[in-house]
């Protein structure tokens, strides 16, 4: 079950050329994205040139699996010669002088970049309402959010603007939007993909991820972007075919841990979807085992102390001098810093910078930041202990279906949207979200988390699940090829 393989067959047979396929997707974006607002920059000329190059490779019989396959990138991955905004006024006119490792790996395999995608500013948000370029709409219901921060990445694939897209995941930013938009998306183990050229939010949490309809496509793409990188010291690399090596194997004997206390208070329709999903895994031969997951509220508090601290440090570089927005009315250096940052950053980014500077202050450091780091270590150890008993942990990807725009502009309410996804980021573990049912006629997702660098177990389990139970009901009509 793979869109990529379906497109590969069409391209190789001559049914369609890479240029024709690219034109189809570009036309669809230009016609339909006015309603969704998922694309910040459409790379029409560049895409057609890359498609021509792909056709030449195909004609010579030297194509790979991804040659000529269109892709959209979240607009925090640097793309040489194309602006990279992070959905911020601060970087509105920034044109990257180099490619991120993620985008370079895609280019090197002959993929066609259609454009750059909307997101919450600097990846800070769970709704994609915090963008300098306006909110993104969920293709399932245009009055609702697509999730965040990779909301544009999820909405674009759900709407059929590309078969695949890149995103980033700091606290659930690929998994929660996947749940809201009926997609499969994965945050791989921390260090398996390079962060070089990816605009930083919280460096010890950030990781590139992939959106698609099918888990097989997600696995194929993660193999494409993963690997060692000399420019990122945290990137340890993974072996070739790390994510796709076990996709054909059945999951009989796999043990899935479930903490019932995380499910009992969910809305009834989501509980039903979870119960059905676990029953389906049992039918495939998996064993369901009761486990106790660390307190998610403590995880949430830990996350929202450490990540703002890292963000405050990372965003200190945007000063109006080296690059980024520069206020034209400043009369001296102090005023230049102050006005450029005041005008250049949005409300949510400024909120997190202020929180970060507060917890890093010498008077507060031990009370907040130091304790949060200690708790992070304790929680990571507790989660890893669970993996001595199970192969994966299952939990919902979100506590609700997609909510309406404006419903959760209160920061604390919005932060709670990440409660199920944050543990994987705190501990650096791989986690995959996939559609499991509907609540109020909107898709909801489940999530599997595994031990570090056991990413292949997750892709294997979800590929086998989708092979037997399908995902057709989660693909919107306009997204079908």
UniProtKB/Swiss-Prot annotation:
GO cellular component terms given for this protein: glutamyl-tRNA(Gln) amidotransferase complex
Pfam family of the protein (one): Amidase
Protein name: Glutamyl-tRNA(Gln) amidotransferase subunit A
This enzyme's EC code(s): 6.3.5.7
Family classification: Belongs to the amidase family. GatA subfamily.
Keywords: ATP-binding, Ligase, Nucleotide-binding, Protein biosynthesis
Enzymatic class: ligase
Catalytic reactions on record: L-glutamyl-tRNA(Gln) + L-glutamine + ATP + H2O = L-glutaminyl-tRNA(Gln) + L-glutamate + ADP + phosphate + H(+)
């Amino acid at each position: 079950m793979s869109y990529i393989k379906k497109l590969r067959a069409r391209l190789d047979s001559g049914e369609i050329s890479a240029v024709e396929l690219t034109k189809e997707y570009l036309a669809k974006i230009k016609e339909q994205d006015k309603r969704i607002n998922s694309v910040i920059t459409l790379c029409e000329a560049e895409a057609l040139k890359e498609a021509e190059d792909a056709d030449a490779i195909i004609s010579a019989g030297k194509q790979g699996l991804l040659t000529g396959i269109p892709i959209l990138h979240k607009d925090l991955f640097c793309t040489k010669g194309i602006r990279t905004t992070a959905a911020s006024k601060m970087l509105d006119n920034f044109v990257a002088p180099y490619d991120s490792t993620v985008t370079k790996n895609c280019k090197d395999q002959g993929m066609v970049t259609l454009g750059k995608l909307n997101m919450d500013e600097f990846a800070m948000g769970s709704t994609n309402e915090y963008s300098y370029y306006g909110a993104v709409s969920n293709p399932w219901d245009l009055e609702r959010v697509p999730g965040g921060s990779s909301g544009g990445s999820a909405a674009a694939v759900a709407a059929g603007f590309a078969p695949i897209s890149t995103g980033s995941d700091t606290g659930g930013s690929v998994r929660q939007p996947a749940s809201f938009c009926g997609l499969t998306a994965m945050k791989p183990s921390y260090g398996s993909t390079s962060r070089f050229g990816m605009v930083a939010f919280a460096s010890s949490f950030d990781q590139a991820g992939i959106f698609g309809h099918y888990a097989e496509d997600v696995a194929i793409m993660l193999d494409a972007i993963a690997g060692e990188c000399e420019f990122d010291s945290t990137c340890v690399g993974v072996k070739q075919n790390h994510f796709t090596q076990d996709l054909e194997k059945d999951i009989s004997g796999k043990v899935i841990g479930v903490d019932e206390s995380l499910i009992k208070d969910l809305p009834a329709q989501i509980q039903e979807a979870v119960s059905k999903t676990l029953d389906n895994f049992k039918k495939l031969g998996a064993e369901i085992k009761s486990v106790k997951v660390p307190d998610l509220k403590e995880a949430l508090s830990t996350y929202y102390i450490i990540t703002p601290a890292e963000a405050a440090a990372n965003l200190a570089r945007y000063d109006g001098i080296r690059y980024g927005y520069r206020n034209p009315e400043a009369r001296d250096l102090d005023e230049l810093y102050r006005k450029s940052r005041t005008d250049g950053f949005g409300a949510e980014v400024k909120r997190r910078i202020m929180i970060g500077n507060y917890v890093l202050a010498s008077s507060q450091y031990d009370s907040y930041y130091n304790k949060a780091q200690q708790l992070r270590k304790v929680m990571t150890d507790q989660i890893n202990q669970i993996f001595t008993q199970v192969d994966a942990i299952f939990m919902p990807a979100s506590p609700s279906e997609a909510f309406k725009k404006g419903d959760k502009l209160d920061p604390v309410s919005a932060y709670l949207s990440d409660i199920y996804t944050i543990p994987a980021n705190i501990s650096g573990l791989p986690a995959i979200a996939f559609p499991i049912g509907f609540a109020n006629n909107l898709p909801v997702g489940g999530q599997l988390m595994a031990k570090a660098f056991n990413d292949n177990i997750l892709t294997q389990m979800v590929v086998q699940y989708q092979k037997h139970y399908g995902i057709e009901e989660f693909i919107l009509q306009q997204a079908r090829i």
